[in-house]
């Protein structure tokens, strides 16, 4: 993920990324990894919950409008299903899936 791609993320996620860079002093690379993991997670959820038109590709799925109510509606089962998706569909290895878990857990 590139720094300019962060603007396409939900405002709450953008604020979180600023916090971890400014206050928690994470490196720019770490912030971009978190951003990419969260973007993947939210795109997955929007597609799975049917909140994106079926003719819109995964990469073009708009997640910028995700709000606090949407985030509050996310369940542990959603996270588990996401990890299964990462393993089976994205072919993420164990280390990548573990990093994604950390990114999501720290955000929530």
Predicted regions and their residues:
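N-terminal core-binding DNA-recognition domain of tyrosine recombinases/integrases
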Residues: 2-3, 14-29, 39-108
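Acidic, low-complexity proline/glycine-rich segments
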Residues: 1-9
